[in-house]
Amino acid sequence: MNHTHETIIAGRPMKVEFGKLGMLSDAAILMSYGDTVILTNVNASEKPREGIDFFPLSVEYEERLYSVGKIPGGFIKREGKPSEKAILNGRAIDRPLRPLFPKGYRNDVQVVCTVVSVENDNLPEILAINAASMALCLSSIPFTTPVAAVQVGLIGEEFILNPTSKEREESSLQLTVCATKERVMMIEAGGDEIPEDTMINAIKFGFDKCQDIIKFQEEAVSMFGKEKKVPELHKVPEEIEEAVREFAFDMISESMHITDRDERNAAMDEVKAKINEEFEEKYPDNMSDIGEAVYDMQKEVVRHMLLKEGKRPDGRAFDEVRNIGCEVGLLPRTHGTGLFTRGLTQVMTVATLGSISEIQILDGIGEEESKRYMHHYNFPAYSVGEVRPLRGPGRREIGHGALAERALEPLIPSEAKFPYTIRLVSEVLSSNGSTSQASVCGSTLALLDAGVPIKRPAAGIAMGLITSKDLTEEEVLTDIQGLEDFFGDMDFKVAGTEEGITSIQVDTKIKGLSEKVIHDAIYGARKARLMILDKIKECIPAPREEVSKYAPKTSTLQIDPEKIRDVIGAGGKVINKIIADTGVKIDIKEDGLVYVSSAESEGVKEAVKIIEGLTKEVKAGEIYLGKVTKIAQFGAFVEVLPNKEGLVHISKLDNKRVEKVEDVVSVGDEILVKVTEIDSQGRINLSRKDAIKEAEEENKQQ
């Protein structure tokens, strides 16, 4: 049976259909917002997966190019691997949902959101989060807490709910808020240096607007939701938990109180070895349960240290940032390099400048078709002292790269001001927490070292949270290290400048964040950010005055759009000759803006001169130095500008009578000529006689 339910959100219809499609899925819904439509299917395995200590949730965000009326480019005319944006959207769906499943639930769960229709005014990634929550709530899977997602824009001082395409262009803020009835589950934001109080108010606005969508989901569940299955939840057997606690708790507590990371890890390795030796014969089939019990006790000790003893694992104050180190200019041949160190976290970012032709072309369902500034993040195994095969970037690397990219995007100079494609690559050399925000700092250093005139330096910091089990006690931590991230409840990343916030990303492991935690995290991040920015400015106070000598040389010129065809020529003949003769790269925009770049400045100058000649208009009354291209009985043809020839009649060749043209000029001669007339057919009439006369008069006056 087909069930439908509908509501209005921000003046546009939101509708869910259940029971019509995907009959063999546990739940399959078609959810629409305006003309944007997402097909969402959710399924779970019948039995828990054995031998694991995590919840195996898989979220897939599938883009279909037919949703925007496109056929995939390239030789193979079908969708390939997910785009970076699809991967990021899949992560954004996963993050608010994962903490809301029952603790100990180990069944495989798969959520597949397929984008089947897109209207640019209504973003599919926002609808997909709502659709995933709706499908899970309607299914028999034990997920019972609806999650809603909205986007918040800011135009002037007004917050806009789910802004349209035009409003997004005008908005200085792109904020996604995911929430339950009680708390905020996830935040993603990019902004043009948004003040802290404005950001907090925007998050509150988004939280309030989520409530209408939560109500919509609850109504649908009450009307046609499936009965929930009773889950088989994994729990460490009480006998094992008590035995491990009695044997090892004091040793674990003593080890976790060691402030030095390496000494603490070595001590814990010894404790784990003793635990294994003690219990592997008695409980040979329960070693994973023993490992889980040890993890729970480590977490318990860390929470007690922070909430009851007021101590951090490394001895810092709750609002203290680790030691900062900044360095630029490390590599001799790169265009810009920044090395940023925060405690045991270290990132080296390298900036490369390229021609405008090297922009990244995007073949996806979004409105953005190309990208001039990009940031890539690499996290090799050696950064944590491990041995693993080197693979391509995973979801985490793509997500961290995009986060650092978003943090600096509002600060990158315009194409007109700085005609380069900019690529940043952050190499994580050592990781002990918050490498994505270290990448923001490293990127700032590299851009300044490369001579990129960014609006202002940016820095990033990760804030953490430790709570009691009943959430009545909360402590916000500044600059969390790996241990606090691993055992903590929140990763609240904030990047920005001294003027305001440029990006936020928030993940939580608990059932949401209170308003107080969000406020304290945002203002705590500002205090830390300003301190880090001071360190960056001490290292390099402003962008280099010139780009690296190894960077391409570029020049821009504006031509009449009607003249573009003259520069390109039939079949690209003219532009290809310029490129071949000068060794440059040429990019021409529709508005007539021309970018010329090359490794050598001489080639750029020569190409610019040729293009100016091709596009310059011949004017009557002007004198030109032209080249004789052809001789006829009645006169000489002279090229006054590239591809622009005129005729000097034999009677206009000299002050005296000329019998033969060859007596005065030969092919290849350069002569001064004056344009006497451009007739109605565009023919150019020239006079050498008039040019000589004017030159003689000027000499007399001098």
Curated annotation (Swiss-Prot):
UniProt domain S1 motif: residue ranges: 621-689
EC number(s)?
A: 2.7.7.8
Where, by residue number, does Mg(2+) bind?
A: D485, D491
Instruction: List this protein's GO terms for biological process.
Output: mRNA catabolic process; RNA processing
Q: What InterPro entries does the record point to? A: ExoRNase_PH_dom1 (IPR001247), ExoRNase_PH_dom2 (IPR015847), ExoRNase_PH_dom2_sf (IPR036345), KH_dom (IPR004087), KH_dom_type_1 (IPR004088), KH_dom_type_1_sf (IPR036612), NA-bd_OB-fold (IPR012340), PNPase (IPR012162)
Task: Please give the CDD domains that the UniProt record associates with this protein.
Answer: KH-I_PNPase (cd02393), RNase_PH_PNPase_1 (cd11363), RNase_PH_PNPase_2 (cd11364), S1_PNPase (cd04472)
- Listed cofactors: Mg(2+)
What is the reaction catalyzed?
A: RNA(n+1) + phosphate = RNA(n) + a ribonucleoside 5'-diphosphate
**Enzymatic class:** transferase
User: Which Gene3D superfamilies is this protein grouped with?
Assistant: GHMP Kinase, N-terminal domain, K Homology domain, type 1, Nucleic acid-binding proteins
What are the residue boundaries of the KH domain, all occurrences included? 552-611
Keywords, A to Z?
Cytoplasm, Magnesium, Metal-binding, Nucleotidyltransferase, RNA-binding, Transferase
The family database entries (HAMAP family) matched by this protein are listed as: PNPase (MF_01595)
The entry sums up its family as follows: Belongs to the polyribonucleotide nucleotidyltransferase family.
What is the recorded function of this protein according to its Swiss-Prot or TrEMBL entry? Involved in mRNA degradation. Catalyzes the phosphorolysis of single-stranded polyribonucleotides processively in the 3'- to 5'-direction.
**Protein's name according to its UniProt entry:** Polyribonucleotide nucleotidyltransferase
